[in-house]
Amino acid sequence: MEKETARIEAFSDGVFAIAVTLLVLELHVPALKAGVNSAGLLIILKDEWPGYIAFAISFFSIFIIWVNHHKIFKQIYRRNTGLMFANGLILFLVSLVSYPSALLARFYMSNAKQLSVTIYTGLFVLINLAFNLLWQQATADKSLLRPGISDDAIKKLRNNYLYGFPTYLTAFVISFYFPDTALLICILLWVYWALSSKKIKFKNGNDKLI
């Protein structure tokens, strides 16, 4: 069966690329100050460390989202309107990542740290919900899926995204009281997704998915 999702995937890859570019634009070169030397520049750069950390974790998160998006579309061969809108919701939310990342970079060392982390983790709750919606739309009509995909494979992939929701939601709730812990939970989840893979058995039995 010929895949009907090539244009969706190409458009999605473009949006992911733009989202990463927006992150980079938040990395500002310090203003030149009269008389500054290498030691002074190093001090200025050290003061900017929240911005670098925010960029790194946000880039990593978008990369993990892109990997999951790529692998889920390996199992989707056809499209309908509901699936395209669900995918559009994912892209919309991913394109917003740069904004809470900028908030995190600017306010992490201030008294507003808690709110910046809450906004950041809240966005990823929504992104996870959008992924679950995408897979629900894909599996509601199995004719959209890859030929030969088993019910067990569908269930495994669904569960793979479902457990992300309570984890993100936990991080979101914790962020109101322990923002550092909330960020750590998100990072650990992304690391887990990056390192783990599940074997989903199709007719050829060779496919792996995160």
Would you name each region that the model predicts?
Residues 1-210:
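Multi-pass alpha-helical transmembrane bundle typical of ion/small-solute transporters
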